[in-house]
Amino acid sequence: MKTKPLFLSGCVALLSFAFVCLASAADTKSAIEKALRDLDAQWSAAAGAKDLDKTVSFYSDDAIVMPPNAPGATTMEAIRSIWKEVVASPGAALSWKATKVEVAKSGDLACVSGTYEQTTIDASGKPVTDRGKYVEVWEKQADGKWKCGADIWNSDLPATAPALSEKK
């Protein structure tokens, strides 16, 4: 008879521990999601401020960047070149906002997606605004910091047709 209360006490203790572990995992996931939203907002602010060094600093050393209508960049030099062109555009403005953050169960990998808006000045001097979406894959580094390992974006605007060559 004494084993039944002891067994029940053990079950209650085990269930309590399980609930604490589940709550802790949910809290950790929420903390990671918040941290990544904050990092993504800081990154957007750096790009909007045309701070090339800070903008590029969000990438991991082995990152790949896949801009629209261009080859992917797999070296920091190539990534820097892409961003140099973006931030150097006169009158350009760029911002983005995360709309979804998915964290892997392992807690060391996450996917951030959202929308962006970029305004550039065309050849006639008029502003042209592009809106689109993006996906980033973030990786937790050995030092505990999060860095973007893959970055791709594309426009919601219809593609422009290539110019037809004139007949002679």
Regions found by a protein language model. Give the residues of each.
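Positively charged n-region of N-terminal signal peptides that target proteins for export
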Residues: 1-5
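Bacterial N-terminal signal peptides
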Residues: 9-21
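Short, low-complexity N-terminal intrinsically disordered segments enriched in polar/charged residues
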Residues: 20-61, 160-168
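A solvent-exposed, acidic/Ser-Thr-rich amphipathic alpha-helical stretch
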Residues: 30-37, 52-107, 115, 120, ...
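A short, structured loop/turn motif at beta-sheet edges
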Residues: 103-110, 126, 139-145
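Sequence/structural signature of outer-membrane beta-barrel proteins
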Residues: 119-123, 156-158
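Short beta-strand edge/turn micro-motifs at domain boundaries
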Residues: 131-157
